[in-house]
Amino acid sequence: MTDEEASTWDIVRNPKFADRIFIKDSARDVYSQLILKVKEQEVADGKVTMDQLMNFTSDADIAAVEEYMKEVKPLVAGWEADFGKDQMVQELGYVNLTWSGDGVWAIDEAAELGVDLRYALPKEGFTVWFDGWVIPKYAQNVKAASYWINFMSRPDIVIRNVEETGYVSVSGAPEVRDAFTDEEYDPIDLSYFFTPADTAVCANPVLYPDKADIERSTQEHDWGENTTKLIEMWSRVKGDNANAFTYILIGLFVLAIAAFAFFARASKARRKKSRRRK
């Protein structure tokens, strides 16, 4: 696979990688990426921003993404929530629409096996996301929850958490920056994350993307009243993703059952005939 092939969302409908593509089984994640692809010309023409696209859930928008996904579906080896990274490490998959933390894990695991995996951020744009600790309005132990959040925000704990999960924290503490500075990587602009002076930090770009990449990103939004329509579209797209081999297995299974039933019936008939002779 070339860097050029991996630089665009069109990679997920590239027949060169048929049956080696794994897509997240997540309607929101997939739709939010592909609406950026489908509407890329409108973004380029300045008619709409990527942030605005995250609210594009009209019938026409949904139909456009569905049409694109119909081209993707025949090439998909699996819709996954967790096993895609393993397929990549084992070289059973060549393309995986995945989360950055899973990407970090897969790249590290593959390197130990001599497999070169890379993480790409498509030129059409992509979404960034975050999970956050919150204290519910009616929480009964606010003090304990506050202690927990403060604990998880400590620089030393942040470092351990990133090392364990592959996902970064929002903490831009100097200790965190220093812990993940590695001369193995080329300098990148992380002034948006740490301090304005951090314009050339040697860090893993999968963990901390360059500022220029972040400027091509946006955030997903809740679909509101259109959620049902989008989920229905997702169900139509996924539908039956069985490939030819799957149908062969199903056919053989059905034949085996039919053969078993036939021989069982024949055997029973022979036993009855034998008893009558006696």
Mark where each language-model region is.
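Non-transmembrane alpha-helical segments in soluble domains
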Residues: 9-13, 32-35, 66-70, 85, ...
